[in-house]
Swiss-Prot record:
Record text on activity regulation: Inhibition by zinc ions.
Protein origin, superkingdom: Bacteria
InterPro entries per UniProt: ATPase_NBD (IPR043129), Carb_Metab_Reg_Kinase/Isom (IPR051804), ROK (IPR000600), ROK_cs (IPR049874)
Family membership: Belongs to the ROK (NagC/XylR) family.
Name the UniProt record assigns to this protein: Fructokinase
Encoding gene, per UniProt annotation: scrK
């Protein structure tokens, strides 16, 4: 049995084949240009690398409710040309195999939950903080969706005194993505993340907002583990700062696991999404 995975990002698509244990046997990276160009390359890949099922995680917003007429679509994305694109419908027209459709962060969350750092617990949250902020919630080893998928990067926070930075989010003045995602860090400092010193005064601000978000996730979902990934979180010195501020904000109200095991980096690194896609392909095949 050979399984397929698609990690569809706003900059690039990663397509891969692999096994039911999430191990990748082959992969390719495709630039995200137009739907016609990018999807033609996706079709070509899986035509020359035939698989039994494909797990797809896409940038969004997307339609994830099977009862929604827009199920399978990329909906209101600002990505030029991709708004109202029937992603799942296109793949169904090309491949007569089981398909699993979800968000890119849900895909990564599932990978970490099944074979990554959260494999020993049933409830976890995976949050990526990079170009944007997105999060996937795993509840009792299943992906959590409500009316639609979560948009936890846009949770409202308390602005720090003296922080007069204009939010980078066009919709919200004090959301996590607007204040602490990679572009916000860049605008605050005028530097690329890799060029910002570990002792730069921006990091206490960024870690405070991430800690606030982790408290919100804790009281809302009661996870066993919060996994932080993405370009901003490549700065490993941020984790102790986040844990310290998290403990201060939670203030002993709720018992949580030891913080070194509770707020953690991804176990699969940049492979979380593709591994999750392979595992979701396996689930789609079993449910077919």
């Amino acid at each position: 049995m050979l399984l397929g995975a698609i990690e569809a990002g706003g900059t690039k698509f990663v397509c891969a084949t692999g096994a039911e244990n999430g191990q990748v046997s082959d992969r390719i990276s495709i630039p995200t240009t137009t739907p016609v160009e990018t999807m033609t390359a996706v079709d070509d890949y899986f035509t020359t690398h035939p698989v039994d099922a494909i797990g797809i995680g896409s940038f969004g917003p997307i339609g994830v409710n099977p009862h929604d007429p827009k199920y399978g679509y990329i909906t209101t994305t600002p990505k030029p040309g991709w708004g109202d694109f029937d992603f799942l419908g296109h793949l169904k027209s090309q491949f007569n195999i089981p398909l699993y459709w979800t968000t890119d962060v849900n895909e990564a969350a599932y990978g970490e939950s099944m074979i990554g750092i959260a494999k020993d617990v049933p409830n976890s949250i995976y949050m990526t903080i990079g170009t944007g902020v997105g999060a996937g919630v795993i509840s009792q080893n299943h992906i959590f969706n409500g009316r639609t998928h979560t948009e936890l990067g846009h949770m409202r926070l308390n602005r720090l005194p003296g922080d007069d930075f204009k939010s980078n989010c066009p919709y919200h003045d004090i959301c996590l993505e607007g204040l602490a995602a990679g572009p916000a860090v860049g605008k605050r400092t005028g530097k690329a993340g890799k060029d910002i010193p570990v002792d730069d005064p921006v990091w206490p601000i960024i870690t405070d907002y991430i800690a606030q978000a982790c408290v919100n996730l804790t009281v809302a979902f009661a996870p066993d583990k919060i996994i932080l990934n993405g370009g901003v979180m490549n700065q490993r010195q941020l984790f102790p700062m986040i844990r310290e501020k998290f403990a201060a904000y939670l203030n002993g109200y709720e018992e949580v696991p030891p913080l070194d095991d509770y707020i953690v980096p991804a176990g699969l690194g940049n492979n979380s999404g593709i591994a999750g896609g392979l595992l979701l392909a396996q689930a789609a095949l079993k449910n077919a």
